[in-house]
Amino acid sequence: MISDITDKIIPEIQEWQKRKLESVYPIVFIDATHFHVRDNGQIVKKAAYVVLGIDKDGMKKVSTITIGKNESAKYWMTVLNEFKNHGVQDILVLCADGLTGLKDAISAIYPKAEYQRCIVHQIRNSLKYVPYTDRKELANDLKTVYKASTEELRYTNLLELEEKWKHKYPGAIQSWIDNWDVLSVFFKFSAEIRKIMYTTNAIESLNSTYKRINRNRNVFPTDMSLLKVLYLSTLKAEKKWSRMVDKWDLCLSQFRIMYEGRI
């Protein structure tokens, strides 16, 4: 049976989960993909949280995959503590969607790390419930915020955006106002670093691989059966990541100036 064959990789997965990680990661991404898993006789929706790091050599690697039901500060403290126990002493910038409790957990475990909420997800969430007739115009107005050349211009454009759209789509606009502190970290960096943080191609392509798994299988019998498939898919995806991030030497020199003594 296929399950008997894949069971042979369980020790390999366990070793992978215990391996030593880099001491410092300039950029870390956390993202989630949801799957249906059987748990105590019931089918429940669980998230596979993927932590992907870009190391000092500019190489992308999946650091950990954890499967859980509930996001909370306590949950994320467990995940980040595990990260620290595997040797990660410092993270310069951590990019993620608005995962519940993550911001507080980062402050507790990696207090020097800067938390950047994912711009791509923020844009998607803002446009999700906007009718097609307004979507293009609002998307263009959002660009004036996240592509503005100066901090002053960005905030001015944000206020203009709020004034124009707040009555028609209050939820979409209020999210930018409420989360500006974790959306605006992005803007302190050069165009080269912002491109890495903005596009998140590595984790997006990885998630598209995971979503294909979802289409091919409706329900996983156990957490381990899900983890086995994710692990094998991750190994396959990582084989394509043979090159360093574009313009990494330039990015690294900027990180060393901005975070002197930490990298």
What are these regions (language model features)?
Residues M1-N40, V93-C95, Q116-N125, E152, ...:
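Conserved, well-ordered core segments of regulatory domains
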Residues R38, D104, K128, S208-K211:
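Active-site-proximal flexible loops/turns
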Residues R19, F35, Q42, L52, ...:
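Flexible, active-site-adjacent loop/turn segments at secondary-structure boundaries
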Residues P111, T144-I263:
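Acidic/histidine-rich catalytic cores and adjacent linkers
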